[in-house]
Amino acid sequence: MIIVILPLLFLTHPIFAEQFNFTLQSFEVALSMFLIVCSMILINMYIEYRTPLFLFLSTIFSSWSFLTYQSLIMFYISLSIAIVILLLNFNKNLKLLDYLKVISLFLLVFICSMIITQSLIFIGHQMFSIKSTNYLNSKITWGKLPFFEILSILKSHFKNILLAKVIFYNLGFVISTLSCFLIFIKKIILKSRFISFEILCMLLLNLSPFMLTIFMGNVEPIRSQMPSMQFVIAFNFLYVAINLTTKSFLAICISLALVISFRQGVTTANLFYSERAKYEEDVVFANRINIQLDSLNVSDRKDYSLVLIGEKKVNSNLVIQGETLGRSFFAWDLGSPYGTSSRAVGFMRTLGYDFKHPSKEEYKKGLLLKENMSAFPKKNSIIIDNNTIFIKLSD
């Protein structure tokens, strides 16, 4: 029954909903997560059988995963630390040097994988003239903002996590870490072997989901904490459960894990429902726009650029919003060079309304015209100027 805690808390976490909303990443990221787990298994097989092939395959699997999604680097670190902690609890006759040898293997595979990853990226840039984006570097605030301002940003973020102020977080992290602290007190009293080392490992494990946040000095998208965040919560509960000897306390621990899993599952289901409801509302709104355009004798959409000014948010009270889930295509990128037009036009095209994307000049012209326009669907909310359609969505 204890082992059920891990998959239940791990698989039901709402961060997965946010991540797998990116359909084009779904298979690749899921496969890479599986390969990281396989890499861990292969390292342990090497420890037992001393077959170099296992270490080689482990490095290949890790390299593949690191290339696929950067947050899986943190997942590798989390799993490595968790395995060391399990060894400390189940292989208590080992010497400290034995544990350090295991850690050295994890480090060896990690370093080799990072070297392979960076080498392949460099070769790809040179051979195919692929330009690297500035996406990650642009979010790093160290050296760009005052030190204490960065600390304030991080403090606010960690406070939101600990107090579960964001829909993706719950009290599972706080409850599990406090429970681990109580286990540490018990082990210190009983003078357990290598307790200082074990506490250090647990501290690093619980910091691992936030390594990217600390590295950037900024709040990254929630999906970048996937899957380390949910793994750490699940492992904390598992760690507490395997160290409880009283059946009543064990029952309480398992019950708490089940309750948190259920609440996570409900939140995840609500997020997926919200995304579906948002999509259907966007379809209805897109059709309303095109029905009105039909009445204005706009025939072949391919001849027209579509400029949308303002935004249209989801109206349903049943929709809850994540970072991307539940957010209308007609409410994205407000303030960007193309406003909401870019994603909204792309969405329209998936429905068969094959508008052209507007130019920056056309969007700037729309910003000038909006002062004399009403918000859709009122009269004068649509202006057709040559082959450009201007629609004001909001004031």
Regions found by a protein language model. Name each.
Residues 1-15, 34, 49-53:
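Transmembrane-helix signature of polytopic, membrane-embedded enzymes
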Residues 1-3, 96-99, 103, 123-128, ...:
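Intrinsically disordered, polar/acidic, low-complexity terminal segments
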Residues 173-178, 242-267:
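Signature aromatic-anchored transmembrane alpha helix within multi-pass, membrane-resident enzymes
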Residues 42-63, 92-101, 249-252:
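Short hydrophobic alpha-helices at membrane interfaces in multi-pass membrane enzymes
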Residues 13-17, 69-73, 80-82, 233, ...:
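Short, solvent-exposed loop/turn segments at secondary-structure junctions
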Residues 17-38, 68, 225-229:
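Multi-pass, polyprenyl lipid-linked donor-dependent membrane glycosyltransferases
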Residues 212, 216-244:
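Hydrophobic/aromatic-rich transmembrane helices and adjacent perimembrane loops
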Residues 1, 6-7, 23-27, 63, ...:
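Transmembrane catalytic cores of multi-pass membrane glycosyltransferases
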